[in-house]
């Protein structure tokens, strides 16, 4: 008997050590190995010849092997457990050698038995043990594009077990982090989401909620609890995005977002759903053979940015809005097409190294959780901008609010009271003081630049998020002289303020203020700022004729998670959401003291030039970049930025001159080569343009803007096949690019491929904007003067002396 037990021990140990067992077979072998190990001493000491034998070495080695085995059951094989595993293997080998000397069985027969057992184990390992116990019912998730591996629903108790990950002794830190995240409260435990769904259900049919469910209520959706109107009182309706959902995603078919992923039921170790002693056995099996668990729960796709895109890239289509395809929030494409990803050759700014979503939103946190790397794990707080959830009465969590505040204030945004235009003259870059005279009209130039942000500012749902610019002028007693963007007594922000947001309109020209995107038809304006870019906001002020004292001019970028209208609509128990001051700048306005200008302000000029270029004020932009090249002559981007303006002005030779200067500073600078390629394309030198684009493409193969320029150049050169290949590369990056589908339609018409031309024509018509919707915007412009002002590409905000302060004079 004992030879068979030792044979089982050896066979299972060899397989576990040298073969990659799947997620079910591995823990099963571990369990067999442990049971055999427990039986060995029982049988061993039951033999009379052993009882009479006083061999100390065999007893010592066996006790050591048993002790280290028990140690592995307790500690697992991670960290210090690796050392225990080494001792366990060595002591077990020595025990077997000694056992041969004192046990009466045939060595050859033992080898044959062990070999046979090993072969049986190997054959068993080939079997597909990944079959899972799912409800035998074909699922219908439409209009969500999400799916399950089997095509069936998954039992809720298989994908709603986050607490087990935290209480099993394996991932308590990660579980606590997740418990304080928006992912935890994505479902009907989030009153803002619940109010949105309630309104959706009251204005549409019940199937539309499944479109929301794939990202917000995956436990409900994939377990079949969203077939009709969801029961929001079920525990599953409050599950959030669980561990098993994110880590159960095994494939992302494309990058169109909307939760277009494939979910698999988690592969479970034996006794996974047991309690008491058997639950302890389950935890022990995971600890002693975690490789299979790790392989199943952490796949390469989980570390990719496309994994995040599946829910943070959104579109609405006819089944949802009964209108047409519209692009919703899209953090992925904003990141992909930016300098943050190192994909955009023409980016104004790049971080020191490329960053992914996880770099910012899953930064490493200190932890002793099992599976930590050097006492660190990927953070699962998922910090962003949500201070609303931890402010709710039922969830009040100051630690969460403070953590989010620190994240928002971590150099994400820079604000700069750059200059003032007085009597048509720009006085800049300002230092700490500006001198004015009574009666003068002053236009302040306030620059806001995105810094440590990998997508547009703001991200997410730009219609409900509320970042804005607040300008306040106070006297030396702290009394307000003038302001723009202050919070009013009714808790709404001053409607004349400058907002960094998008205003969405429904078919009647009303603002979308109920988180009701299914009724969205067009956008009145979108004042968000791209990553690594800048905007300039203009404020006009007429200096009072009796102006005598100094004024402290303070500019702040504020952030409130939801505007007041959304809060009123969503909450039964109204609260005041926190306002986070993300960035601040200040100067003193004086009648007597002279203006102070700043030194070493080349990059401030660069930001101003970028902002003015985005507003198409080419002269102001060019003058700003001229100052950059004077103040920072070794900054190659300064000359490239000059060339950008000159190209838009049609001054191609002057632009080439600036680009040559940049190339003198940085040999083969891809950014300079790219703009030289654009000049060659515009002037009809297609051969030179193609050569330059090929050079740039070697460094930036995933730059969609560059590829579209390259493809169009090939089209102009009548290289239809080459143009087609390049444009198809663009679709690999963004399958929903309307412009690319249009150009491919033209190319296939030239090639005589009517089928492909028709295909791309249909895609173009699907993804292109609806020009007729502009009429809705015109109606809204007449009704909402402040929003109409914001919708102008270049506009200013008037600073008016407050009534109550003027009464003090």
Put a short name on every predicted segment:
Residues 1-134:
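Membrane-embedded alpha-helical bundles that constitute the cytochrome b-like, heme-associated redox core
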Residues 615-627, 637, 648-661, 668-671, ...:
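Structural signature of tandem alpha-helical TPR/SEL1-like repeats
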Residues 27, 127-156, 174-208, 225-531, ...:
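Primarily the internal scaffold of c-type cytochrome electron-transfer domains
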């Amino acid at each position: 008997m004992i030879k068979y037990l030792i044979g089982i021990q050896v066979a299972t140990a060899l397989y576990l050590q040298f073969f990659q067992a799947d997620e079910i077979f591995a823990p099963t072998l571990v369990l067999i190995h442990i049971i055999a190990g427990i039986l060995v001493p029982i049988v061993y000491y039951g033999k009379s010849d052993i009882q009479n034998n006083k061999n100390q070495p065999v007893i010592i080695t066996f006790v050591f092997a048993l002790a280290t085995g028990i140690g592995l059951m307790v500690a697992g094989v991670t960290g210090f457990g690796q050392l225990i595993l080494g001792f366990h293997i060595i002591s077990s080998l020595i025990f077997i050698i000694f056992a041969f000397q004192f046990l009466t069985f045939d060595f050859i027969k033992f080898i044959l038995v062990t070999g046979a057992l090993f072969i049986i184990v190997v054959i068993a390992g080939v079997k597909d043990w990944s079959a899972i116990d799912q409800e035998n019912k074909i699922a219908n998730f439409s209009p969500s594009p999400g799916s399950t591996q089997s095509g069936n629903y998954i039992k809720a108790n298989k994908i709603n077990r986050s607490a087990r990950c935290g209480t099993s002794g394996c991932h308590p830190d990660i579980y606590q982090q997740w418990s304080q995240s928006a992912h935890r409260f994505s479902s009907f435990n989030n009153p803002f989401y619940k109010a949105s769904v309630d309104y959706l259900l009251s204005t549409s049919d019940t199937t539309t909620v499944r479109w929301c469910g794939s990202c917000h209520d995956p436990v409900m959706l994939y377990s079949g609890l969203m077939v009709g109107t969801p029961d929001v009182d079920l525990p599953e309706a409050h599950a959030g995005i669980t561990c098993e959902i994110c880590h159960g995603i095994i494939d992302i078919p494309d990058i169109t977002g909307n939760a277009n992923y494939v979910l698999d039921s988690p592969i479970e170790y034996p006794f996974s759903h047991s309690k008491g002693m058997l639950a302890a056995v389950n935890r022990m099996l995971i600890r002693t053979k975690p490789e299979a668990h790790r392989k199943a729960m952490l796949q390469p796709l989980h570390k990719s940015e496309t994994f995040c895109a599946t829910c943070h890239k959104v579109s609405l289509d006819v089944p949802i809005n009964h209108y047409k395809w519209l692009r919703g929030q899209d953090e992925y494409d904003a990141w992909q097409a930016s300098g943050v990803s190192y994909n955009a050759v023409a980016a104004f700014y790049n971080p020191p190294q490329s960053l992914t979503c996880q770099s910012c939103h899953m930064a490493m946190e200190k932890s002793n959780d099992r599976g930590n790397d050097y006492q660190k794990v990927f953070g699962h707080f998922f910090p962003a901008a949500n201070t609303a959830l931890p402010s709710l009465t039922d969830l009040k969590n100051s630690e969460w609010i403070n953590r989010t505040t620190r994240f928002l204030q971590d150099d994400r945004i820079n604000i700069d009271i750059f200059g003032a235009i007085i009597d048509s003259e720009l006085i800049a870059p300002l230092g700490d003081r500006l001198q004015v005279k009574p009666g003068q009209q002053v236009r302040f130039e306030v620059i806001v630049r995105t810094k440590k942000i990998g997508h547009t500012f703001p991200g997410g749902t730009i219609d409900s998020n509320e970042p804005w610019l607040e300008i306040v002028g106070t006297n030396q007693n702290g009394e307000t002289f003038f302001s723009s963007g202050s919070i009013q007594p009714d808790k709404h922000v001053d409607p004349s303020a400058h907002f960094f947001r998008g205003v969405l309109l429904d078919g009647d020209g009303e603002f979308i203020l109920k988180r009701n995107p299914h009724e969205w038809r067009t956008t009145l304006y979108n004042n968000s700022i791209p990553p690594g870019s800048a905007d300039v906001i203009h404020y006009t002020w007429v200096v009072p004729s009796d102006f005598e004292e100094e004024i402290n001019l303070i500019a702040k970028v504020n952030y409130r998670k939801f505007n007041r209208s959304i809060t009123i609509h969503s909450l039964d128990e109204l609260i005041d959401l926190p306002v986070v001051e993300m960035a601040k700048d200040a100067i003193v306005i004086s009648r007597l003291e002279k203006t102070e200008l700043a030194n070493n302000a080349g990059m401030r000029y660069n930001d101003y030039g970028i902002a003015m270029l985005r507003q198409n004020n080419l002269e102001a932009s060019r003058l700003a970049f001229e100052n950059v090249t004077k103040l920072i002559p070794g900054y190659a981007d300064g000359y490239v930025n000059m060339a950008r303006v000159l190209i838009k002005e049609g001054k191609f030779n002057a632009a080439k001159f600036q680009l040559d200067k940049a190339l003198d500073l940085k040999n083969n600078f891809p950014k300079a080569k790219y703009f030289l390629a654009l000049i060659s394309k515009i002037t009809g030198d297609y051969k030179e343009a193609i050569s330059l684009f090929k050079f740039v493409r070697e460094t930036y193969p995933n730059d969609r803007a560059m590829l579209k320029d390259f493809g169009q150049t090939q089209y102009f050169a009548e290289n239809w096949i080459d143009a087609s290949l390049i444009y198809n590369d663009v679709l690999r990056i963004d399958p929903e690019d309307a412009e690319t589908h249009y150009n491919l339609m033209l190319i296939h018409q030239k090639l005589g491929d009517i089928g492909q031309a028709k295909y791309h024509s249909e895609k173009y018509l699907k993804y292109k904007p609806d020009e007729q919707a502009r009429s809705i915007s015109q109606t809204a412009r007449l009704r909402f003067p402040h929003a109409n002002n914001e919708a102008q590409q270049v506009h200013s905000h008037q600073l008016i002396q407050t009534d109550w302060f003027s009464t003090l004079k």
